[in-house]
Amino acid sequence: MTAPFTAETGDAHIDDVVGVEVTIDGMLVIADKLGLTDFPPSMGIRLNIPQPDLRKVVWEQVERDLSAQGVLDVYGNPHPEVAAMVDTLARADRTLECRWWRRDAGGKMIRFVVCRKGGRHVVAARDNDLLVLQRVAPQIGLAGMVMTVLGEGSPANVEPLTGVADRLAQCRTAEELTGYGIPPTSARAYASIISEPDGWVEIVANERHPGGTTSQVDVAAGVLDAKQGRIVSIPRRVNGELYGSFLSGTKDNLERALEGLVEFLPSKTWFDKTDADNAYQH
């Protein structure tokens, strides 16, 4: 195994490579060469061949495939931009971990993350054994990063709905929802979206501390898509009690949902101040 990858990845980009597509085995080979072992848990990236001899044979073939793909150079070293993206994924300062259940695609689950290390941002998505990593600009905002995977969506025509999370979670019918002071049309739309979504996303946030320990929030933001449109959910804590708010799924409201989620982290922010200053200079 080579020495751990320590190049600074928070500032200027190395070249015009903005994304890479690899298998899980390919990611494990790249990570091994960079001395990286930990990835966001939701991505499920872990050693899958326990026998060292068999793993050596498989990885040798994977290395040949990665070299043909241009991910590894003639010396077997990862492309610098690929190395920087993998390093961001493995050593992120902040992470949004997302699980996207797609009823409209046979019930499959797509896992994806938004990661920040310094001023660098990477979106990584997993579909079965295929991983796609993409570098993104911080200027597009957290909602823009999440929407690189989810797509724009059509915002549902609903009024905001807020209530104590535990009680709101028990509501299933329009009649129950009208008790929260929203118009019957919005209540019917919410009831239909909640009962028959085409897909839904659960999003949690993590923060990495100096020394390598991490904190994860104990609440989640959400996105639901249905034929009536998209809605987003925002967690809030008021006087120690957890509230949930549902809003039409516009990009601005998704940004509010993600910012509200990040406020549950110990730092209460996606950027450290110096990182924010650096990120928006590029």
Swiss-Prot record:
Q: List the disulfide bonds.
A: none
On whether Cytoplasm is a keyword of this UniProt record, the answer is: yes
Q: What does this protein do?
A: Part of the ESX-1 / type VII specialized secretion system (T7SS), which exports several proteins including EsxA and EsxB. Specific chaperone for cognate PE/PPE proteins, plays an important role in preventing aggregation of PE/PPE dimers. Also plays a role in DNA conjugation, in at least recipient strain.
Quaternary state and interactors: Interacts specifically with ESX-1-dependent PE/PPE proteins.
Additional comments on file?
DNA conjugation in M.smegmatis is unidirectional with distinct donor and recipient strains; mc(2)155 is a donor strain while MKD8 is a recipient strain. Mutations in a donor strain that alter DNA transfer do not always alter DNA transfer in a recipient strain.
The text of the family note is: Belongs to the EspG family.
- What is this protein's name? ESX-1 secretion-associated protein EspG1
